[in-house]
Amino acid sequence: MSTITSYFGFLLAALTITSAIFIGLNKIRLI
């Protein structure tokens, strides 16, 4: 159970970082 929770947390963090970088790149392109 602990492994699944840690894996889900890691996946959520990776998704958040990826989306943040993607949004940042889009803002740079608009400027």
Swiss-Prot record:
Key words of the record: Chloroplast, Electron transport, Membrane, Photosynthesis, Plastid, Thylakoid, Transmembrane, Transmembrane helix, Transport
Any one of the GO CC terms: chloroplast thylakoid membrane
Location(s) in or outside the cell: Plastid, Chloroplast thylakoid membrane
Pfam families given in the database record: PetL
Membrane topology: Single-pass membrane protein
Chain ranges passing through the membrane: 4-24
Single annotated GO MF: electron transporter, transferring electrons within cytochrome b6/f complex of photosystem II activity
GO annotation (BP), single: photosynthesis
Function: Component of the cytochrome b6-f complex, which mediates electron transfer between photosystem II (PSII) and photosystem I (PSI), cyclic electron flow around PSI, and state transitions. PetL is important for photoautotrophic growth as well as for electron transfer efficiency and stability of the cytochrome b6-f complex.
Subunit structure: The 4 large subunits of the cytochrome b6-f complex are cytochrome b6, subunit IV (17 kDa polypeptide, PetD), cytochrome f and the Rieske protein, while the 4 small subunits are PetG, PetL, PetM and PetN. The complex functions as a dimer.
UniProt record similarity statement: Belongs to the PetL family.
Name this protein carries in UniProt: Cytochrome b6-f complex subunit 6
Organism: Morus indica
Source taxonomy: Eukaryota, Viridiplantae, Streptophyta, Embryophyta, Tracheophyta
